[in-house]
Design a protein with these regions (language model features):
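Domain-level signature for proteins that mediate thiol-based redox and metal-cofactor handling
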Residues: 1-188
C-alpha cells in the first residue's frame, strides 16, 4: 500500500491520501481523543504523541499536529493509516455515520431566506468545498442572518493562517457577487 502525502496551506496540517475510500459519504472531524472514539482510525492517530486533530474526507485523512516536527510524526502517522487499512477495519465505529449534527449545530436562518440559503449552499457545494477539499479541509454552511453568512471550517482550514484571507477575499467575494443579500462571511 502506498500513501501519498501532501502539504496543506496550514503548516500544522498534512493531508494523507491512502488510495482507498476513507468515507463513502460525509466528513468526520475529531479535535480531541473523546471525539476520536467514534472512529478506530482516529483513535489510532490520537494515540500518536503530538497529534491534535484529524479530519476524514472521501479519499483523504488530514492530521493536525500540536507540537513536534513532521519528520518525527509522519512515519508514525503513515504506519497507523497503513495498518488500519491493511487490517480492513472500519473507519467509523459500529457503522456510525460520519457527519453528525451536534446539538446546537443546527442551521439557522429566517423563514423568508430559504431561496437565498439554497443559492449560498449551492455555491459552497459547487465552487468552494471541492477546492477546500483539495487542501484537506471542508467548509460547511451554518447560518444566515442580517446579511451575514456563518460557516464552519474543518480539517486543514481550522486554525490555518490563510483561512481568514480565503474566507474574506475568496468566499465572501464569491457569495457577494452571486447573492447581493450577502454582506459578510464569518467563521463559527
Amino acid at each position: 500500500m502506498f500513501i501519498q502525502t501532501e502539504a496543506t496551506p496550514n503548516p500544522a496540517t498534512l493531508k494523507f491520501l491512502p488510495g482507498k475510500t476513507v468515507l463513502a459519504e460525509g466528513t468526520f472531524e475529531a479535535r480531541d481523543a473523546e471525539a476520536a472514539r467514534r472512529s478506530p482510525l482516529a483513535e489510532k492517530l490520537f494515540g500518536i504523541d503530538g497529534v491534535s486533530g484529524v479530519f476524514f474526507g472521501s479519499d483523504f485523512v488530514t492530521v493536525t499536529k500540536a507540537e513536534g516536527e513532521w519528520q518525527h510524526l509522519k512515519p508514525a502517522i503513515l504506519g497507523a493509516i497503513m495498518e488500519h487499512f491493511m487490517t480492513g477495519a472500519p473507519v467509523m465505529a459500529d457503522g456510525a455515520p460520519a457527519s453528525v449534527v451536534e446539538e446546537g449545530d443546527e442551521e439557522f436562518y429566517a423563514e423568508g431566506d430559504e431561496a437565498i440559503v439554497v443559492t449560498i449552499k449551492d455555491l459552497l457545494d459547487t465552487r468552494v468545498r471541492p477546492a477546500v477539499a483539495m487542501d484537506g479541509g471542508d467548509i460547511t454552511f451554518r447560518g444566515f442572518r442580517d446579511g451575514v453568512v456563518f460557516l464552519n471550517m474543518q480539517g486543514s482550514c481550522q486554525g490555518c493562517p490563510s483561512s481568514v484571507a480565503t474566507l474574506k477575499h475568496g468566499i465572501e467575494n464569491l457569495l457577494r457577487h452571486f447573492v447581493p443579500e450577502v454582506q459578510e462571511v464569518r467563521p463559527i
